[in-house]
UniProtKB/Swiss-Prot annotation:
Assembly with partners or alone: Homotrimer. Interacts with LTC4S and ALOX5.
Keywords recorded for this protein, A-Z: Endoplasmic reticulum, Leukotriene biosynthesis, Membrane, Nucleus, Transmembrane, Transmembrane helix
Name by which UniProt lists this protein: Arachidonate 5-lipoxygenase-activating protein
Location in or out of the cell: Nucleus membrane; Endoplasmic reticulum membrane
Function: Required for leukotriene biosynthesis by ALOX5 (5-lipoxygenase). Anchors ALOX5 to the membrane. Binds arachidonic acid, and could play an essential role in the transfer of arachidonic acid to ALOX5. Binds to MK-886, a compound that blocks the biosynthesis of leukotrienes.
InterPro entries per the UniProt record, alphabetical: 5_LipOase_AP, FLAP/GST2/LTC4S_CS, MAPEG, MAPEG-like_dom_sf, Membr-assoc_MAPEG
UniProt topology in membrane: Multi-pass membrane protein
Organism lineage: Eukaryota, Metazoa, Chordata, Craniata, Vertebrata
Gene name of this polypeptide: ALOX5AP
Assigned GO CC terms: endoplasmic reticulum; endoplasmic reticulum membrane; nuclear envelope; nuclear membrane
Organism: Macaca mulatta (Rhesus macaque)
Domain statement: The C-terminal part after residue 140 is mostly disordered.
Lumenal side: 1-8, 78-80, 129-153
Family to which the UniProt record says this protein belongs: Belongs to the MAPEG family.
Principal location: nucleus
Annotated transmembrane regions: 9-30, 53-77, 81-102, 116-128
Amino acid sequence: MDQETVGNVVLLAIVTLISVVQNGFFAHKVEHESRTQNGRSFQRTGTLAFERVYTANQNCVDAYPTFLAVLWSAGLLCSQVPAAFAGLMYLLVRQKYFVGYLGERTQSTPGYIFGKRIILFLFLMSVAGIFNYYLIFFFGSDFENYIKTVTTT
């Protein structure tokens, strides 16, 4: 790959790798809680603490493919830097959700709601990128250049 291509995706790759490390951390928490309660074997049922860790991890895993899809779509189709920043914010919010879920369930609600908003923002960035592509394709007008012109004046 040439440097320009790598430069266009490096921030997205960094956020993706950080999310992989975070998933490993969550899985380690589940494994640790399972072994604490059940000895050496992994079982899906157990104490309330294990149920909370397992459910929090499962909820994070359920939203993960959607996060990756909108992160990369927004970064490739619209702009890499805001998409990567939103991705980092999502990872911080997901961490807050996970830790909050282990305590009182009401502590996880702000993280959950803000995480949904970040995914919506990334989705809207993706739609804007697709819209801009078709504006250029059909009308020869680049909306992104117009936005840059307006914001710099």
